[in-house]
Each structure stands twice: as C-alpha cells, then as structure tokens.
C-alpha cells in the first residue's frame, strides 16, 4: 500500500493497482467488486449476514491463535474488529452486491479487508498496512470463501428464523383467542364452495392456529441442518491450506460464541456441493406462506358482501375501497398478505433452481439463495405482524347469520342417514331446496321421528361438536 493523496490510498492485487478511498475500511478487492455489477442490492441490506460473517471470522481467529498459527496480538486486534462489526458498527462498509459471481468471494474479501483495516487501527497502524495484518494471510488464514461464506449464510438464516417464529407464534395465538371467543357460535362449513355441514367459528379459527403451529415445528427441524457447517474444508472440501486441527477448533469456538448446536459436516466434500439445508429452509418458509395464504383467502371470502356475498364475518375496515363506488371497503390486509405469499412462492422456485445448479465440487450460487431466503423471511415476518394487528385481532363474526346458514343448509340432512337411510335423507334435502324450507321442517312431515328427537338430531351446534366435545377437548 502507498499513499497517493490524502483522499486515496494505492493498493494492489494480482490484476494490478487501484486507488481506494482513504476514508473507507474496504480494500482493492471490494473496490473492484463495486464497479463490476452495479445491481445496488448490497450485503448491507442483510445485517444478519454481516453480523454472522464477522462471528465466523472471530471464531476462526480464535482457532488460529489457539493452534499457534497467528500472532496473539494480531488475533486480539482481529477479534476486536469482529466484535465491532457484530455490534452493528461499520455497517456502511459492505457495499458489494449480494448477487455476485464467485460464490461469495466479493463478500468474503469485503469482510476480510474491513476487519484487517479496522484491526490495523486498533493495533495503532494505518489502514492498508498489510505488512502487519493482511486480509488474506491473517484474517482469512485457514479459510476459503467456499467454507466461510456458506457458514455465515446459514448462521444468518438461523438468526432470521427467530423473529419469523415469534411472529408466527403471535399470529397463532390471535387465532386461538378468536377460537376461544367463538367456540359456541355455529355456522356452516363449505366444501367446493358448496354448503356442507355445521361447524363453529371457533373450529375454523382453531384450524388456522394448528396449521401455523405445524410451521413452527418445521423451523425447529431446520435449525440443526443449518447449524451443520463446513469450516476448515476450505476450497473444495479437502482442507487445503488449513491445519488439520483447525476444523475442530473453529467449530468448537463458533458453537461457544453463538450458543447454537453447531457441528461439522460429516463429509466435507459432499457438504461443499450439497445445499440441502437451503432446500429444507425454503420448504419450511413456503409451507408457512401456503398456510398464510389459506387463512387470508378464507377470511377474504368469508368477508365478502355485505349484501351479496357470504358475510360470515367482517375484517376491520382500514381504507376506503374505491375511487368511484361510495362506502365500498376492501379486505386490503388479506390481499396484502396474499401478495407476500405469492412472492414467497417465487423465492422457493429461485432457491431450488440455484441449489440444482451446483456443478462438480462447488455450488456457486449461495448469494442468490441467502438473499432470497433472508428477504422472504423478513417479508413474512412483517406480513404476519400486519395480518395479526390490522386484521385478525379485529375480526367480528355475524353470529346470527352464521346460525341461519347452519339451520337452513340442506346438507345437515346427512345427520338423518343413520336413522332413515341415505336415499330418504337425500329426498328430504332435495325437497327442502326446491320448496325453500328447512330440512327440519320437511323431515317433520316425511319421517316418523318424534319432534324432540329431530330437534336433537338436527341441532347445528351438536352436529358441529360431534360427540359433544369442543375442538380443543377432542385434540387433547
């Protein structure tokens, strides 16, 4: 490194020399990357990734010092720089595009250079004095982009699962609360959008909560997959340029730092090419999106009306719905959630394509995978918050209308099958539809069953509860 002016410093690499702004912590590799793609979707937009990468570098520095591979004073300065980055400092020093060629090399070198230059300052040296602390020889010692970048990506995804799971729990609880509130309010169930048999609003809301809880379990299963890392495998899994002891030491220290169940991949070469953890993570996120879309779709449909739709329930009015139709109010929150879910389906396709594109000893497409997954997780986290706060918690049911639907549906004739047979019950249902009367009224004329027994058999709330249990009691 040499000074060219008070505004720049001159650095060199295998391609040649380049001036780097004197006031930045990155170096020549980052400077070249900035001018390469110009997508303006940078690593700094994913703070989880930056924090995770600094954590990986800190664990590696501790391992290198423990094994006597790096001077303790240098290691201390490197660790201190990493801690600052983990705390959110220097966040503006990561300008490389997330989607990059080279399997994350630009991100790795950006991190190496920022750590090296900040460590130099901590050690009382000038930025760019790589004769003392070098981005490759010291910060990146015993490492490659190909083992550290995926490790950082996976830790970032684990970090992002936390708020996503918390939003899922809160939304599930909101549906549980609605279920408890309306466990005795009966309505009609529908299959193929046709009248089916009675159920309670509580059962319907409880089903949404149950689906969300299954997604929480899926996240729990994904974490151990993401926590299986390949540190020390370096370029292609053979561990070239790394001390044989480094792998175990780095994994140990990373587990201690993060408190996560970090383990070493059992087959380093296979782990270098296999991105199965990303597939599993994407699948879990997509499953959540499917269930959210189901809930949003159903609420939107049940909210239809108010005169010519189902009108089973009302979602909160949040905005005027039309520039031409007075008093029209749209279900804007369910529709917003739907669009977020559509985006997640696209995310899943992208991730699966990227995973499938791994060739020979390396998959070069981690950058787009982690970008899509982190973006999708943040999107769903916020979508569930607005769904809960601005929609679900304010839902009001139209209990009288729901009860009328349940009592007047011809499908409750199914309850008569056991007593008079399917064909006779079907005839009663058909006559009820044709004459506009209820099944109870027609059955009173066309069967010998006593009135009290008919009232009991065709009681909508009894039919909804099966053997007299609430949905929660049955589940327990």
Q: Where are the regions a protein language model picked out?
A:
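Conserved, well-structured ligand/cofactor-binding cores
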Residues: 2-476
């Amino acid at each position: 490194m040499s000074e060219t002016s008070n505004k720049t410093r001159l650095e060199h690499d295998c391609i040649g020399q380049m001036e780097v702004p004197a006031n930045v912590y990155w170096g020549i590799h980052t400077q070249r990357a900035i001018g390469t793609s110009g997508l303006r979707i940078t690593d700094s937009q994913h703070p989880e990734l930056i924090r995770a990468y600094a954590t990986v570098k800190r664990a590696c520095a501790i391992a290198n010092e423990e094994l006597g591979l790096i001077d303790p004073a240098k290691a201390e300065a490197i660790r201190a720089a990493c801690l600052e980055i983990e705390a959110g400092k220097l966040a503006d020093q990561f300008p490389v595009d997330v989607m990059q060629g080279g399997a994350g090399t630009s991100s790795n070198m950006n991190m190496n250079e920022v750590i090296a230059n900040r460590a130099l300052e901590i050690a009382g040296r000038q930025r760019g004095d790589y004769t003392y602390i070098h981005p490759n020889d010291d910060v990146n010692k015993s490492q490659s982009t190909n083992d550290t970048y995926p490790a950082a990506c996976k830790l970032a995804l684990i970090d992002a699962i936390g708020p996503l799971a918390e939003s899922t729990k809160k939304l599930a609880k909101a549906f549980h609360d609605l279920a408890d509130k309306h466990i005795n309010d009966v309505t009609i169930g529908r299959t193929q959008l046709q009248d089916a048999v009675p159920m309670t609003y509580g059962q319907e809301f409880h089903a949404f909560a149950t689906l969300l809880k299954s997604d929480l379990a899926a996240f729990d299963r994904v974490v151990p997959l993401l926590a299986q890392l390949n540190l020390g495998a370096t370029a292609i899994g053979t561990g070239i340029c790394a001390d044989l002891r480094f792998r175990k030491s780095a994994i140990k220290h990373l587990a201690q730092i993060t408190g996560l169940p970090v383990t070493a991949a059992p087959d380093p070469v296979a782990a270098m090419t296999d991105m199965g953890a990303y597939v599993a993570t994407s699948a879990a996120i997509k499953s959540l999106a499917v269930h959210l879309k189901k809930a949003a779709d159903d609420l939107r449909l049940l909210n239809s009306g108010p005169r010519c739709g189902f009108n089973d329930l009302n979602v909160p009015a949040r905005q005027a719905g039309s520039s031409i139709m007075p008093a029209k109010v749209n279900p804007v929150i369910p529709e917003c959630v739907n669009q977020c879910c559509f985006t997640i389906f696209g995310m899943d396709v992208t991730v699966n394509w990227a995973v499938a594109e791994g060739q020979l000893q390396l998959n070069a497409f981690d950058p787009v995978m982690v970008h899509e997954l982190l973006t999708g997780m943040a999107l769903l986290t916020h979508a569930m918050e607005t769904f809960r706060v601005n929609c679900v918690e304010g839902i009001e049911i139209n209990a009288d209308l729901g009860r009328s639907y349940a009592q007047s549906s011809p499908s409750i004739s199914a309850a008569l099958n056991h007593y008079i047979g399917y064909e006779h019950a079907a005839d009663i249902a058909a006559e009820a539809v044709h004459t506009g009367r209820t099944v109870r009224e027609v059955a009173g004329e066309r069967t010998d069953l006593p009135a009290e027994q008919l009232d009991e058999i065709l009681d909508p709330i009894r039919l909804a509860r099966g053997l007299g249990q609430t949905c929660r009691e049955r589940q327990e």
